[in-house]
């Protein structure tokens, strides 16, 4: 039977490759005239590529040994040509990776690391991504030790495939084998973080920056730009500003898109004065002419603080400078009008937008809908939809995602599912944001069984699961105390090449702590530290609060001490939980000592602080002290809330009852 008939259908296009010369043919003919038949080899590899790792060469089957001997005369360039052909399609790509160890075992071509690096480079040049399954299953190198060339090639492929966890492991291997990572390694890793939908994880960025400084590599302007962009997207404008200053100190100017990202981050943090100063320094006072995106970043800040006058002035200045506003510009202004309750002004702006030749898209209407959502006016979602249809604009995936989120936030799960069904009826495929929003809404609405059903439907739809998806499910399973499910979900997340972020670890600490599984909660913090990540104040607060709920004041105090040992200052929120822990344990003196500590360290007690102290006093029946604390709260400028007033009434009622008795 011909060898080509043994090949799977997906590999038949490769059967025409070079043929072996017939017996008796002169071997002195030019290589280009020589033909080699690779059909038997491809057929053999197609049946063995899914098998476990092959045995050492000394115990290889006779078939493979004979097959290898028949290809001993094939020159290196022909192996390269075959690899390129196999890498040309996703169907035959696994076969290309099966060929590499075959060549290595029989020493048929030069070092495997170089071959693999060449293959990865070919994929990169063609703009194709290395399949995730291959990234996870293929070893970093089939040689020992691995070469830095191969590790960097795999790192770049992992980054291109948006698999930062795999890229991080490869960076760790570089350091483990005492190879000095180059700037490209960090650039590739930052690219993988910036190419994801979610903001980069702050702890991961800190770890990367620390590693870069430890390696004593001097970042160039592109790497500084990537670092600034990453920290800005992670909502860490102070770190981004520090990096900007470091770049300027050595005479480097970051790319304009990095500066724009930083202006946007400052605006989002309501630090508009700093955003203005940066805009003036780099764009108006500098040699770089501001583009639409830079103006939009500044405009975003004005919208955030509700400064409509300044927002409108930005549009005027753009017109004077000859910079055309785009859809995002108008969207931000429409958003500002909607948030200010000026729906008619928003409608007028939509007409101006069309007059300027910028047709409003679904995104503009999604911003209007988001404005109503944030103002609590979810019922106006239907009016926005009507206005859309009147303007001849069809809802897209993003609009439906905002609509589902709007209904989900106000527990209108029926409307959310209707929007989801309508979306699919219109041929719009839900993405990871759609599924996450819908699953999370059902979790928060207490519909856990339905949330799990939706998660299963998401899997069946082949929609890729993201870190946020796993975080939602870990929280759900933790609330139901399904601990095996929690561990399985975390393991699956890592197997998919996703990096557990600060939210993942905080969720784990919270669900373990609230269930009294304190050992597991502490283990999570230690595991995070072992991974080189820094626990956040939120994580420590979750653990302090968990101990407080069970009256374990000493344990809560130890967590606060550990927090300070890690260089984190305890916030008012954390110390309020510590006061609650002492109160639950009936240790009033210690509870008031925390109040004194707050005053001495410049932390302003809030209404929760005083309410928690009043609750502690009532618990130990020191009712007469409650009015004193209530008076101190008012004197300090804290407005009593309903709970504080209820505490006072309760104490006064007990005091009156005791006097009567």
From Swiss-Prot:
Disulfide bonds: none
TM stretches of this protein: none
GO biological processes: mRNA processing; regulation of translation
Transit peptide: 1-57
Keywords of this entry: Chloroplast, mRNA processing, Plastid, Repeat, Transit peptide, Translation regulation
GO cellular component, one term: cytoplasm
Function: Required for the processing and translation of chloroplast mRNAs.
Protein name according to UniProt: Pentatricopeptide repeat-containing protein CRP1 homolog, chloroplastic
């Amino acid at each position: 039977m011909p060898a080509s008939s043994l090949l799977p259908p997906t590999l038949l296009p490769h059967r025409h490759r070079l043929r072996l010369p017939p017996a008796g043919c002169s071997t002195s003919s030019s290589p280009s005239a020589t033909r080699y038949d690779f059909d038997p080899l491809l057929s053999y590899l197609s049946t063995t590529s899914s098998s476990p790792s092959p045995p050492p060469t000394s115990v290889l089957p006779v078939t493979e040994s004979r097959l290898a001997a028949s290809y001993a005369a094939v020159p290196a360039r022909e192996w390269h040509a075959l690899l390129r052909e196999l890498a040309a399609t996703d169907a035959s790509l696994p076969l290309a990776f099966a060929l590499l160890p075959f060549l290595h075992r029989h020493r048929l071509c030069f070092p495997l690391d170089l071959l693999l690096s060449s293959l990865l480079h070919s994929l990169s040049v063609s703009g194709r991504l290395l399949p995730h399954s291959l990234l996870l299953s293929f070893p970093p190198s089939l040689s020992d030790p691995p070469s830095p060339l191969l590790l960097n090639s795999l790192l770049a492929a992992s980054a291109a495939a948006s698999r930062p966890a795999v890229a991080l492991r490869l960076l760790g291997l570089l350091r483990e084998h005492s190879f000095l990572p180059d700037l490209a390694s960090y650039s590739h890793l930052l690219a993988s973080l910036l190419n994801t939908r979610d903001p980069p994880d702050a702890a991961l960025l800190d770890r990367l920056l620390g590693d870069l400084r430890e390696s004593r590599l001097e970042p160039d302007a592109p790497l500084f730009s990537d670092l600034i962009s990453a920290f800005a997207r992670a909502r860490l404008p102070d770190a981004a500003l520090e990096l900007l200053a470091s770049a300027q100190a050595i005479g480097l100017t970051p790319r304009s898109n990095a500066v724009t990202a930083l202006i946007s981050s400052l605006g989002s943090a309501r630090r508009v004065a700093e955003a203005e100063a940066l805009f003036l320094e780099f764009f108006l006072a500098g040699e770089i002419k501001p583009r639409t995106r830079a103006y939009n970043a500044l405009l975003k800040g004005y919208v955030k603080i509700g400064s409509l006058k300044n927002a409108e002035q930005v549009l005027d200045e753009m017109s004077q400078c000859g910079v055309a506003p785009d859809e995002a510009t108008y969207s931000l202004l429409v958003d500002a009008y909607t948030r200010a309750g000026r729906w008619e002004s928003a409608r007028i702006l939509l007409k101006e937008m069309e007059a300027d030749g910028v047709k409003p898209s679904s995104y503009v209407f999604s911003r209007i809908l988001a404005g109503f959502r944030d103002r609590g006016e979810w019922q106006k979602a239907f009016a926005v939809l009507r206005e859309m249809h009147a303007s001849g604009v069809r809802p897209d995936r993003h609009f439906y995602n905002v609509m589902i989120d709007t209904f989900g936030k106000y527990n209108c799960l029926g409307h959310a599912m209707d929007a989801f069904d309508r979306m699919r009826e219109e041929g719009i495929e839900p993405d990871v944001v759609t599924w996450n929003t819908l699953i999370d809404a059902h979790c928060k609405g207490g519909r856990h069984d339905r949330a799990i059903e939706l998660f299963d439907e998401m899997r069946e739809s082949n929609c890729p699961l993201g870190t946020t998806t796993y975080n939602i499910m870990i929280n759900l399973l933790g609330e139901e105390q399904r601990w095996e499910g929690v561990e399985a979900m975390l393991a699956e997340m890592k197997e998919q090449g996703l990096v557990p972020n600060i939210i993942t670890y905080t969720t784990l600490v919270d669900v373990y702590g609230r269930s009294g599984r304190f050992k597991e909660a502490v283990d999570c913090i230690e595991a995070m530290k072992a991974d080189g990540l820094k626990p956040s104040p939120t994580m420590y607060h979750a653990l302090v609060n968990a101990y407080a709920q069970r009256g374990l004041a000493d344990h809560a105090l130890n967590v606060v001490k550990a927090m300070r040992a890690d260089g984190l200052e305890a916030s008012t929120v954390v110390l309020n939980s510590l006061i609650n822990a002492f109160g639950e344990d009936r240790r009033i003196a210690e509870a008031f000592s925390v109040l004194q500590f707050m005053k001495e360290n410049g932390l302003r007690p809030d209404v929760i602080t005083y309410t928690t102290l009043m609750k502690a006093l009532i618990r130990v029946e020191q009712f007469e002290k409650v009015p004193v604390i209530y008076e101190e709260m008012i004197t300090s400028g804290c407005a009593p809330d309903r709970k504080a007033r209820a505490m006072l009434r309760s104490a006064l009622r007990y005091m009156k009852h005791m006097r009567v008795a």
